[in-house]
Swiss-Prot record:
The lineage of its organism: Bacteria, Pseudomonadati, Pseudomonadota, Gammaproteobacteria, Alteromonadales. SMART domains: PKS_ER. GO terms for molecular function: L-threonine 3-dehydrogenase activity; zinc ion binding. GO terms for cellular component: cytoplasm. Catalyzes the NAD(+)-dependent oxidation of L-threonine to 2-amino-3-ketobutyrate. It is an enzyme of class 1 (oxidoreductase). The active site is at 40 (charge relay system), 43 (charge relay system). Belongs to the zinc-containing alcohol dehydrogenase family. It catalyses: L-threonine + NAD(+) = (2S)-2-amino-3-oxobutanoate + NADH + H(+). Homotetramer. This is L-threonine 3-dehydrogenase.
Length: 341
């Protein structure tokens, strides 16, 4: 089958002819329709320090997808051939304490589709049926293909009660922008998102952010005054992994504020802990999606009128995958979709 693989320990990604995966007793075989390029895939493409330590070669990569069930193992229940599905890319062990307690997203033995095992940038993908999520008929293939990153946004944004709150999001990548849309949809008052990429800030404006702030030109403190906020932000969603952005967030949080962190900062990031301690801030780390509460919330948010379509800015045939990666790497895009049909 046709597949995009990381063949060599160097920058790049390659179209290959890979063997069709075999279906185990508890697995689904999914014929891929659409995939989306994730920031993780860009790290793998660039072969940065994280990728060099994490990614085996050769391996089929990719983990954002939608497809159709074409075969299944003999033990599978609840699915049928023809079902349209996406899936949770974190494969969990089922026997650690967190798995047995129902906190599956905190499994300490997690492996990742397209990271530690064969991925979705291929004509066919095998995953455990447990990880598959049926897509409702009124949700498009395009939106279903980005459920994985949308889930990161939903998990982060809904970590705390947002109704009537003032929310600061640092980092206007696709996940940060989707988090802004979620926050407005569920009833936040002011949603302010910051970045230095004007293209993506404009996308955030289209998606409903109260203010999209280019911090190269404008101070958050001035935006707070302009919006009539007298006590700082109630909720912070850190999506950038940039130390200066995180410290700016801490400076502008209200006392008793809550911060959810999805962005991965450098390991040696300096933090002004006085801001955390004396303001009584709560900081929560976010990894992946809650299984499978986040997935049901994603579908319900879209069905209740949340419009994510503006975040999908480019689509390419899989044969033009290089153009898709180039566009994603340029930073002048939202989500980039590769079509396998």
């Amino acid at each position: 089958m046709k597949a995009l693989s990381k063949l060599k320990a160097e920058p790049g990604i390659w179209m290959t002819d890979a063997p069709k995966p075999e279906v185990g007793h508890n697995d689904l075989l999914i014929k891929i329709r659409k995939t989306a390029i994730c920031g993780t895939d860009v790290h793998i493409y660039k072969w940065d320090e994280w990728a060099q330590k994490t990614i085996p070669t050769p391996m089929v990569v990719g983990h954002e997808y939608v497809g159709e069930v074409v075969d299944m193992g003999q033990e599978v229940r609840g699915f049928k051939v023809g079902d349209r599905v996406s899936g949770e890319g974190h494969i969990t062990c089922g026997h650690c304490r967190n798995c047995r307690a129902g906190r599956v997203h905190l499994c300490r033995n997690t492996t990742g589709v397209g990271v530690n095992r064969e991925g979705a940038f291929a004509e066919y993908l095998v995953i455990p049926a447990f990880n598959a999520f049926k897509i409702p008929d009124n949700i498009s293939d395009e939106l279903a293909s980005i459920f994985d990153p949308f889930g990161n946004a939903v998990h982060t944004a809904l970590s705390f009660d947002l109704v009537g709150e003032d929310v600061l999001i640092t980092g206007a990548g696709p996940i940060g922008i989707m988090a802004a849309a979620v926050a407005k949809h569920v009833g936040a008052r002011h949603v302010v998102i910051s970045d230095v990429n004007e293209y993506r800030l404009e996308l955030a404006r289209k998606m409903g952010a109260t203010r999209a702030v280019n911090v190269a030109n404008e101070k958050l403190e001035d935006v707070i005054k302009e919006l009539g906020m007298t006590e700082g932000f109630d909720i912070g969603l850190e999506m950038s992994g940039v130390p200066s952005a995180f410290n700016s967030m801490l400076n502008n949080m209200n006392h008793g504020g809550k911060v959810a962190m999805l962005g991965i900062p450098p390991s040696d990031m300096a933090v002004d802990w006085n801001q955390v301690i004396f303001k009584g801030l709560v900081i929560k780390g976010i990894y992946g999606r809650e299984m499978f509460e986040t997935w049901y919330k994603m579908a319900s948010l879209i069905q209740s009128g949340l419009d994510l379509n503006p975040i999908i800015t480019h689509q390419y045939s899989i044969d033009d995958f290089q153009a898709g990666f180039d566009m994603m790497i340029s930073g002048q895009s939202g989500k980039v979709i590769l079509n396998w049909d």
